[in-house]
Amino acid sequence: MPLELLYNVPIPGQILMQVFVAVAMVYMLYRHRRDALSVLLILLCCPRVFLFFGSTMGNVYKVVMLLLCGYVFVQQRAAVAYQRKEGWILLLFALFSMEFFWTAAYYTQNTLTIIFSQYSRYVEAVLLYFIIKKAIVMDGKGDRLLRLLYEIGLMQIIISVFKFAVFREQVESLCASFSIYGGDMGTTIPILWFIVLWLYRKGQFSKLDWLYLLGLLFVGFSSGKRAVMFILPIVVFVFFVYVQGRKVGKYALYVLAFVPLLFYLGVRLTPTLNPENQVWGSFDWDYAFGYAEEYQFGKKGIDGQTANFKTEQLQYSGGVISTYNSKLEADGRGGATIAMFKLLLGMHPTADSDWWGLGFNSMYSTDYAEFDKLPLTIQLNHKGSATGFFQSYVTIGLAGAICTVLFCFCFWFYIKNRRLRWTIMGICAWEYFMYTGSIFRTPVFMAVLFVVMHYSNMEMQQKRRAQQR
């Protein structure tokens, strides 16, 4: 069985890391072996243990996870948690499913394996929504689930510290217990697990909790992530000041002082964010934000995204008239999203491939050179700039992207706390439209937000009952 190894990273270190992650997973499974939902969530957080043994084992893992989700759904009788007002979730899931299979069957070339692997994650999300709702609202397991997620977050921190001790440098691809290829989760994990910590501690952090938060930032640092250094401090500020509705008292001042410290440490610890391009370089505000703008919008910047459309041209050669395809050029992740909204608003002509996509192989089985030649109206400067929104456009088209947005965002309208609702939607919007879209594509990330959602709803319901008495 071929192992999935990164040949630019020391192989003995990768094997040592794999053993360490596997041991951590087994330990967590043993601690929570009596609860099927806990076992499911732990396994969903440890895909790299199985992906390490090749694509075949990875596909087996995905099948097992779907079956285990179905088993827990039946075993926990999660269907009883359904309420008529949640019919929108099922309706939009049905709409998304019809568009997904219509595109996969008639407009794109996909293998059954890749269709299953992509669609199963959305099925798991729907099942997990009702499983977690039943566990928290009807079975009273909210505190237990928060404790479990807290421990899983601690496991990610320990694994990241061990990784840095083994390699003595940032390794982007090996991200905690989740990823072997691609480190984008190094941005998402700190954000989601901060929300878990905030809810678990009721917004009251001790010194150890702030240390835990620094550990989450280290998860991103060890994977060489830059975005988390900007986004996490903003998320921390929003939760303590806006979501919590706290007046600016003594505790809030401590929080306000800690947020800039997070940003300061992030800039100095991340080589690409300081002029010296080294760990613990100098703090240069202009340099850091200049890099961030170029990262999001390319060298053209935000203003350069407005006049970048190649019009059709005719070429006469050998008695034959040929036409160059029109291309809407886009630089960076922000540029990709701007270009997509131009297409959706009808500012530029579209082709059939724009509306129905080119299939999952075109996104996930192409190298950078092949990606540049895809017959789409939008031409991205390079594949690494593809946001979650743009990936939906490539694979299932503009129609599929619209259905994805409607389905995946509909969950958050059931959050009763208005401030928390808009904050969660804002985080998901940034992550899908301006980053990689890993929240919607990773069932356990959706599960984390479902725990936050249902636990918060339960707390609000309990407060209302107490007030009525």
Across the structure, where does each feature detected by a protein language model lie?
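N-terminal signal-anchor transmembrane segment
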Residues: 1-74, 98-105, 225
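Interfacial loop-to-transmembrane-helix boundary motif in multi-pass membrane proteins
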Residues: 37, 82-95, 122, 131-159
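Aromatic-anchored transmembrane helix interface
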Residues: 58-69, 85-104, 109-134
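Alpha-helical transmembrane segments of multi-pass inner-membrane proteins
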Residues: 143-169, 181-244
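Hydrophobic transmembrane alpha-helices and their immediate junctions
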Residues: 147, 205, 249, 370, ...
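Long extracytoplasmic/lumenal interhelical loops at the membrane interface
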Residues: 170-176, 322-396
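Transmembrane alpha-helices of multi-pass inner-membrane enzymes
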Residues: 193-196, 236, 407, 424-434, ...
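A membrane-periplasm/extracellular boundary helix in multi-pass inner-membrane enzymes
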Residues: 218-222, 243-324
